[in-house]
Structure formats: C-alpha cells, structure tokens
Amino acid sequence: MLKKLLGIIFVSTLLTNIVVALEADIFVQTTVDRASKLLSDNISKEKKIEELKLIAKDTVDIEGIGFYTLGSNRKNLNDDQKKEYAKKFEEYFLKSFSSRLAEYTNPEIDVFGKEVLNENYTIVNSTLKATNERPEIKIDWRIYTKNPDQPLIRDLIIEGLSLARTQKEEFASVLSSNNGEIEALFKTLEEFSNK
C-alpha cells in the first residue's frame, strides 16, 4: 500500500513538472511571437519602444531581477531606499531592454527545448536565427514558475552569458568604487534613463 501511495505521489509530481515546463516554453514562444510581430510592424521606433516596455512589464520579473542585481547590498538599504531603487531600476531596465530590442526587425526565435530545474524555475532553450548580418545566437530563458498562471522571465543567458549576473557585476563595481554608497548607483541609473 505504501509503495502504491509513493508511486502515485511520484507520478503526480512528475506530471506537475511536465505541465510547468510546457507552460514555460509556451510562455516564451508566445512572448517572442508578440515581440516579433511588434518589431515587424510598420510603426515608428518610439512607438515600438513604448510597446516593448509594456511587453516587458507583462512578462519580466523586473523587481526580482533588480534586487538580484543589487546583491547583498540590498540588505543595507532601508525601506525608502528599496522603493527608490526598485523605481529607478525599473526605469533603467525598461529603457535598456526596449531600446536594444527596437533595433531588430523581425527577429526569428525558435524555442526547441526546456528543462525543469525545480518547481520554481524552468530553463527554456531557443535560438535566434542567423541572418546575413549576424550568426545564430543561442538564448536560454530562466523562467520563474512558482506561480504557473503567471510565469515570469528572470534571466536571459545568451551564448552562456547571464545578463542578470553581468548586470550584478556592473552594479557591484559602481558600488565598490563609491564606498558602497547607494546614491552613486541611483545616479548611474538616472543618468542612463535620462539619456
């Protein structure tokens, strides 16, 4: 009886993980298709940027990425500083994300695989198809799946390089060269956002 019960629990867990993984790759493909359609539309770059920001707000865990990139420095912030950082990081992230992506016209991304890491994370594998201007690029998406009804992008790993980790290192460098003063990072974020 105990073996049968354990078998049922194991199969249930396995099926739950398969459903989460399926949702994660469908989520990525849907997000990619949405962005690709927008980028191929005959609208101004400014309009594309605004629409890309909306897509990012719907699909990316901006706050989670923001506090990850702050690293252990977040422990030193009071509540007001955390709120200010979250606001400034969101502005920074949205501008960086949308202005870079707006340069692409009709990017073709194929989602081809996935790996459930645990109940909270799934890695979705894809490639950005090659064109005459660029080679094929491997992109892995780290999807936060704790809430399967609303998966969120937590990181992109492009050709093995984590964008979130790279951002974390850049922010650590700014803080390190300014004696850990969060105001220096705030200023850096503001300057980028106001360009």
Regions found by a protein language model. Give the residues of each.
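Solvent-exposed loop/turn segments at secondary-structure junctions
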Residues: 74, 91-92, 130-131, 159-163
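Sec/Tat signal peptide C-region and signal peptidase I cleavage site
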Residues: 15-21
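Surface-exposed, charged secondary-structure patches
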Residues: 95-137, 188, 192-195
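Low-complexity, intrinsically disordered terminal/linker segments enriched in charged
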Residues: 155-195
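Sec-dependent signal peptide recognition
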Residues: 2-11
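Early exported N-terminus immediately downstream of N-terminal targeting peptides
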Residues: 23-101
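Short beta-strand edge/turn micro-motifs at domain boundaries
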Residues: 136-138, 142-165
